[in-house]
Amino acid sequence: MLTRKQQELLLFIHERMKESGVPPSFDEMKDALDLASKSGIHRLITALEERGFIRRLPNRARALEVIKLPEAYSPSIQPRRGFSPSVIEGSLGKPQPAAAPAPAKPVADNGNSVSVPVMGRIAAGVPISAIQNNTHDIVVPADMLGSGEHYALEVKGDSMIDAGIFDGDTVIIRNGSTASPGDIVVALVDDEEATLKRFRRKGASIALEAANPAYETRIFGPDRVKVQGKLVGLIRRYH
């Protein structure tokens, strides 16, 4: 199964070769997928090659061959332009147009509770490809939120268990693009994969730190990580 970005790149290469007979340049691929650097394109091409979708032809510049396309290929699928907060769609169904998290809405209980949109699932483990979609709303105590816009995510994985965040929990996130060292954040890696981790700085780099010794801390250049919001609350259902 391909991630959204992998599929976008594969179809962009395929359509360009149909039009001109030659693959696009790395700069063209970077711009088409709205990535910050060509290193992200190199990683996507390597992943496509490992999965048997493309082949690099030796001793030739810009030499790529598309071997196969996804089974659900549609010519109408085009690389996205721009960026939006990213999580996995709750139903794992067809991606819907992205929309910014809506402000929390008061509910009819004397203003003590507010409704927060659940935007899907977030990885607390290995980062997972992500899209944004408002699946449903939940009601939370108003004093949990404070100021700003908020959204909720359902946790998938066990990498944050030592921080008290378990698989199946719902985390409440304050929307924002900045974080302080030690904050637990929603982080987008390479404009492709979303994960819930503790934010640290290692010199000029950014470290995404798990709260489970089974997972390694991952270090990235600052251009590869975008903060999507900070953890402000957690809801757990007992069955």
Curated annotation (Swiss-Prot):
Functional summary from the UniProt entry: Represses a number of genes involved in the response to DNA damage (SOS response), including recA and lexA. In the presence of single-stranded DNA, RecA interacts with LexA causing an autocatalytic cleavage which disrupts the DNA-binding part of LexA, leading to derepression of the SOS regulon and eventually DNA repair.
UniProt xrefs under PANTHER family: LEXA REPRESSOR (PTHR33516), LEXA REPRESSOR-RELATED (PTHR33516:SF2)
Keywords for the protein's UniProt record, in alphabetical order: Autocatalytic cleavage, DNA damage, DNA repair, DNA replication, DNA-binding, Hydrolase, Repressor, SOS response, Transcription, Transcription regulation
Highest rank taxon of the organism: Bacteria
EC number: 3.4.21.88
InterPro entries reported for this sequence: LexA (IPR006200), LexA-like (IPR039418), LexA/Signal_pep-like_sf (IPR036286), LexA_DNA-bd_dom (IPR006199), LexA_repressor (IPR050077), Peptidase_S24_LexA (IPR006197), Peptidase_S24_S26A/B/C (IPR015927), WH-like_DNA-bd_sf (IPR036388)
Entry coiled-coil feature ranges: none
Protein name (database record): LexA repressor
Cross-referenced NCBIfam families: lexA (TIGR00498)
Reaction(s) catalysed (UniProt annotation): Hydrolysis of Ala-|-Gly bond in repressor LexA
Protein family: Belongs to the peptidase S24 family.
Protein species of origin: Rhizobium leguminosarum bv. trifolii (strain WSM2304)
Pfam family, one: Peptidase_S24
Subunit structure: Homodimer.
Organism lineage: Bacteria, Pseudomonadati, Pseudomonadota, Alphaproteobacteria, Hyphomicrobiales
Molecular function via GO: DNA binding; serine-type endopeptidase activity
SUPFAM superfamilies: LexA/Signal peptidase, Winged helix' DNA-binding domain
DNA-binding region per Swiss-Prot/TrEMBL record: 26-46
Annotated site residue numbers, Cleavage: 124-125
Gene Ontology biological process terms, A to Z: DNA repair; DNA replication; negative regulation of DNA-templated transcription; proteolysis; SOS response
Enzyme class label: hydrolase
